[in-house]
């Protein structure tokens, strides 16, 4: 990893959880992100999980895999899973990975 990585969780109190990811998502941090998303998706009180990439500056294939892992676990537990605010090279990485159809990539937001 060449840059900082931070994650902040916000619970809206009504079953919605927003995971805000900042910095770079690469191989060095992808496992940690996967575990964070899995943990959030497995919480009984969660109905909708949003991963906000508005301040994410880089994502490689390992980062894409983390999002897909989080989505898979969320859907298995009956949760909605949304990736929001994918911009610039992060959006391009999601398109290049071929997950646009699966994640419904649309106007800076990814929804599943």
Predicted regions and their residues:
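STAS-like cytosolic regulatory interaction modules
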Residues: 1-58, 68-112
């Amino acid at each position: 990893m060449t840059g900082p990585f931070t994650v902040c969780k916000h619970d809206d109190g009504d079953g919605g959880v927003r995971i805000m990811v900042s910095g770079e998502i690469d191989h060095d941090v992808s496992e940690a992100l996967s575990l964070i998303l899995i943990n959030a998706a497995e919480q009984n009180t969660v109905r909708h999980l949003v991963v906000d990439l508005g301040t994410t500056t880089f994502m490689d294939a390992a980062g894409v895999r983390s999002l897909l892992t989080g989505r898979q676990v969320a859907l298995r537990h009956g949760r909605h899973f949304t990736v929001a605010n994918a911009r610039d090279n992060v959006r391009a990485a999601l398109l290049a990975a071929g997950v646009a159809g699966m994640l419904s990539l649309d106007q800076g937001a990814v929804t599943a």
